[in-house]
Amino acid sequence: MTTKRIAVTPGEPAGIGPDLVVQLAQQAWPAELVVCADPELLASRAKRLGLHVTFRPYLPDQAPRPQEAGTLTIAPFKLVTNTVCGQLDEQNSAYVVETLRYAGEKNMSGEFDAVVTGPVHKGIINQAGISFSGHTEFFAHQANCPDVVMMLATQGLQVALVTTHIPLAYVAKAITRQRLHHIIKILHADLISKFAITSPKIYVCGLNPHAGEDGHLGREEIDVIIPALNELRAEFQMNIVGPLPADTLFQPKYLQDADVVLAMYHDQGLPVLKSQGFGKSVNITLGLPYIRTSVDHGTALDLAGTGKADIGSFVCALNKAIELSSKN
């Protein structure tokens, strides 16, 4: 099997991202991990944590080779100003965004096989005057993808979302037949092309309690969700089950048969997933022309430089990126 080349962006330099990357370097990996970062930042963080890491330059003209324990392959970027653990500095926001831009470009060109992203701080990037609503939106805009899908995965459960980071008061209006068509088509296509699932089984949550109770607890199921699902079944022969009440759907008898659960909004699906696999789940962006996975946590500024950050989610994100890239 050909060795894959995975881009890794540590994210916010004052957060735990650099800590996690130098901790991950303590073990061997079956892919080449190209870390897009300032090597001085990583060296400083490794020293602070008492870890030994040897840096080697990224050589794009050479064939990728598995990452040896104790090493990191570096695509170098320079911080604008020195970073203090736990202290945000807007001067370094452009650095963070530039690492993402590079990783996205090289994935689109085929130089990299996937990208794994560490946590960023949206607030400090916007404070620097750079419009930034998140990794997902950044990569989607860069790749000219009008629609992408956020899916989180842990052992035995994958949950995709129809709506993501919007206020709960706006969710019902955001769920339209057109949006459901776009989301489910992307979900179905990527489960086939990236996950190698021949006929994906998609289980869909209702929006309202009891999936609307025949319209007595809301009409979104009757007016929007059921018609959209029926159209997709009829036109594309998709294997879709639902809409089912969310409190019913998240039971073993349904989950054991589902390749993915489609939740209508963020806090409908993700609490169940994080309860089942907190610290061991991974965020996957579907609909991009390449594989992108991410940790499921934030920058944890208070833990930066302490050695107390849990690498579990980053390990899962890397393993998932390697697994998916090996199928493509």
Swiss-Prot record:
One of its GO terms (biological process) is pyridoxine biosynthetic process. Pathway: Cofactor biosynthesis; pyridoxine 5'-phosphate biosynthesis; pyridoxine 5'-phosphate from D-erythrose 4-phosphate: step 4/5. Pfam families: PdxA. Gene3D superfamilies: Isopropylmalate Dehydrogenase (3.40.718.10). Belongs to the PdxA family. It is an enzyme of class 1 (oxidoreductase). The active site is located at the dimer interface. Catalyzes the NAD(P)-dependent oxidation of 4-(phosphooxy)-L-threonine (HTP) into 2-amino-3-oxo-4-(phosphooxy)butyric acid which spontaneously decarboxylates to form 3-amino-2-oxopropyl phosphate (AHAP). It catalyses: 4-(phosphooxy)-L-threonine + NAD(+) = 3-amino-2-oxopropyl phosphate + CO2 + NADH. It comes from Shewanella oneidensis (strain ATCC 700550 / JCM 31522 / CIP 106686 / LMG 19005 / NCIMB 14063 / MR-1). Homodimer. Binds 1 divalent metal cation per subunit. Can use ions such as Zn(2+), Mg(2+) or Co(2+). Its EC number is 1.1.1.262. One of its GO terms (cellular component) is cytoplasm. Substrate binds at residues 135-136, 274, 283, 292. Keywords: Cobalt, Cytoplasm, Magnesium, Metal-binding, NAD, NADP, Oxidoreductase, Pyridoxine biosynthesis, Zinc. The keyword Nucleotidyltransferase does not apply. Its cofactor is Zn(2+); Mg(2+); Co(2+). The lineage of its organism: Bacteria, Pseudomonadati, Pseudomonadota, Gammaproteobacteria, Alteromonadales. Its main location: cytoplasm. HAMAP family: PdxA. A divalent metal cation binds at residues 165, 210, 266. This is 4-hydroxythreonine-4-phosphate dehydrogenase. One of its GO terms (molecular function) is NAD binding. It is found in: Cytoplasm. InterPro entries: PdxA (IPR037510), PdxA_fam (IPR005255).
